[in-house]
Amino acid sequence: MLPTPSDLAELRRCLDEIDDKLHDLLIKRAEVVSVVAASKREGKLAAFQPGREAQIIRRLVDRHSGDFPVATLVRMWREMLAATVQLQSMFAVAVFAPIESQGFWDLARDHYGSHTPMSAYHSIGQVIRAVTEGRASVGVLPMPQEGETDPWWRHLLSKDEDAPRVVARLPFGGRGNARTDGAGALAIGRGVQQETGQDRVLVAAESSTDISRGRILRTISSLGLVCTFFASYEHADSAVNLIEIEGFVPITDPRLDSFRNQLGGALHRLLPFGGYAVPLSAAVLAKSGGGLTGCATGAAKG
């Protein structure tokens, strides 16, 4: 049972005891992370695992109860996860942050940690070069929009398995007090997308210009796939279409083989462009439960 409200000194002692236990667990967690890092090195796995991070946060949100805000819980764990990536390897972020739109910096900081090395760049090309040249592990760029005259994503199309691709969508856990100039963002980096249970996949379809958007979308739908975003860029006699698909659909999925076959020679190439774990919804972030019912001397919640 909690102390009575009139016993402030005992309540503070209770909080201090909880803080000590939380701190002890953080120390223990860092010790386990060091062993995980060694295991990843032996298995030649990347320290940065965005899919795993999303699964951790979703699991905690699902089990959460009490008055502590879910959005704050997510932010705390984002800081902790960012710190543990730093414990495992070098990690830096390149951010598109033009003078007139600083909101992307806030999104990057909130997701990748306030103590993670971050560099601001005034052009999208600089961000892409920082990632492709290895000066940054991740680059944060604006969400693609339909009708762009020179979309940044067309510069990253490659068959190379090690080429940078989309790894996350920001914000994952709500915008908080981040500046609202600029819409959401996509993060690009190297690595293989991991299935998390709630995913989006991006593919780029290079085709002749005489194949219509409607035909592409009808073909996708006929295969039982759901397109959640579509943008195209035309150049000379060819077009590149960025297609976002609901769910985890790797480039080797038989349905994408059928997509290639149905479009035939009109489809020149179908390239993977990464994907991301679906961010938490506003409804999930607003979730709350009952109040505090115990402290460190009993069953602690909150």
Where in the sequence are the language-model features?
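Domain-level signature for soluble enzymes in the chorismate/prephenate branch of the shikimate pathway
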Residues: 1-302
